[in-house]
Amino acid sequence: ARVAATEARFDQLAAGTRTIVVNHFPLRADLAVLPRIPRFTIWCGTTRTADWHTRYRADVVVSGHLHMRSTRWRDGVRFEEVSLGYPAQWQQSKTVDDYLRPILPAPPPVAGWGEDATVLRHW
């Protein structure tokens, strides 16, 4: 029911409207992969959202469930996992500002980042 309600809201946007999609869970299963244990999935979602980034013309997709800060690219769209992590992972010498990063305007691309690139963020 929640997916259908959100799709109905997206469908009301004027043609060509760019979006910023924000969701607690990642929209795609391929974004919920533990690099050290790739056979184990931490996916908690639905495949019905897998194409929202292209179907609803997202400039960026933001989520935070995984507790693994990262920047990933899929289909030319940037996906930001912006969790602050668990308190035990916080470095006491840093402030919350040290953990923040720009969403828009988009930061400049990093050389070598191409389609399906992943950069895990360790602060």
Enumerate the language-model features and the residues they cover.
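Active-site-proximal loop/helix segment associated with metal-binding centers of metalloenzymes
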Residues: A1-I20, F25-R36, G114-R121
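Divalent metal-coordination and catalytic microenvironments
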Residues: V21-H24, H65, F79
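Binuclear metal-dependent phosphoesterase catalytic core
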Residues: V33, F40-I42, T46-D59, H67-W123
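Hydrophobic "anchor" residues on beta-strands that sit immediately upstream
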Residues: I20, V60-V61
